[in-house]
Amino acid sequence: MANVFVNINDLSNQELLSMIHQALLFKSGQFIPVINRQVVANLFFENSTRTATSFQMAEMKLGYQRIVIDPNKSSATKGESLEDTLKTLKAIGIDTIVIRHSLRDWYQPFYEMAGKEVPKLVNAGDGNGQHPSQSLLDLMTIVEHFENFVGLRVRIIGDIYHSRVARSNAEILNRLGVEVTFSGPKEWQDQSLEQFGSFVGIDKDLGKQDVIMLLRVQHERLTDEENQDFTIDKYHEDYGLTQDRYRKLKSNAIIMHPAPVNRDVEIDSDLVESDKSRIFQQMKNGVYARMAILNSLTIPSLISGVGK
């Protein structure tokens, strides 16, 4: 793990809990190491507000020297392969690179090269594959509220098939002892996730859930036919967190969403800032979770020692 952070499920439970603990220390202001002379590059082939900005904020807080590369102005537009881009950046002196790419598993060919022939690698999202930094900040947010994972019930609702968040979170939550269930349109279910939890109707046992994790409808990944058939009102009625559904939730349940939020689609607009919502807390936690990720690549001994 010392040279890559590409899949949250590559971490042992001890590494994961230590990283969450360090993120909480960063948030409390108790522990801010200064990273001298390290250079990190950010290369996002897909649009991003929260992930891109919070990685840059994390880099600033840690003292990294930062470079932002616009792929539309890079040699990728001339046909340069991702491998050659990475080798070029390593040769120039980039220590770590944060990449978001539409290609699922873009990082697979580079595991052995990371930190040697190419920079150390951070996956900021790969197609509908993994979103490990989002998973870490989500776990951090759950720990802040519940202090533990074992025995919790998490309902993931929405566009499951196209969501890297659903895939990342379902596997790691299941491993940590959480009971995971999924709800959403039948055509957006992903049978490969049934090993981590069952698909149920949205209203089944909704009042027994500890965490409601809503997912954005990813129109950019839908077919033209799917987008034409989609109606906001119908989706909100069938799968959205409406006021009626909100009133059924447990008193200590929390609402989460990786954002961007489509108000009055996945969730009633008034509920985005409700008492149960942790949506903006997730965004805040994203900075500290990503600080822990970057720090684990620069000073891995700190991660192995924190929380023991």
UniProtKB/Swiss-Prot annotation:
PROSITE patterns linked to this entry: CARBAMOYLTRANSFERASE
Class of enzymatic activity (EC top level): transferase
Keywords: Pyrimidine biosynthesis, Transferase
Pathway listed: Pyrimidine metabolism; UMP biosynthesis via de novo pathway; (S)-dihydroorotate from bicarbonate: step 2/3
GO BP of this protein: 'de novo' pyrimidine nucleobase biosynthetic process; 'de novo' UMP biosynthetic process; amino acid metabolic process
Binding sites annotated in the UniProt record for L-aspartate: K78, R164, R216
Binding site for carbamoyl phosphate: R50, T51, R100, H131, Q134, A259, P260
Record PANTHER family: ASPARTATE CARBAMOYLTRANSFERASE (PTHR45753:SF6), ORNITHINE CARBAMOYLTRANSFERASE, MITOCHONDRIAL (PTHR45753)
The name this protein goes by in its record: Aspartate carbamoyltransferase catalytic subunit
Gene, per the UniProt record: pyrB
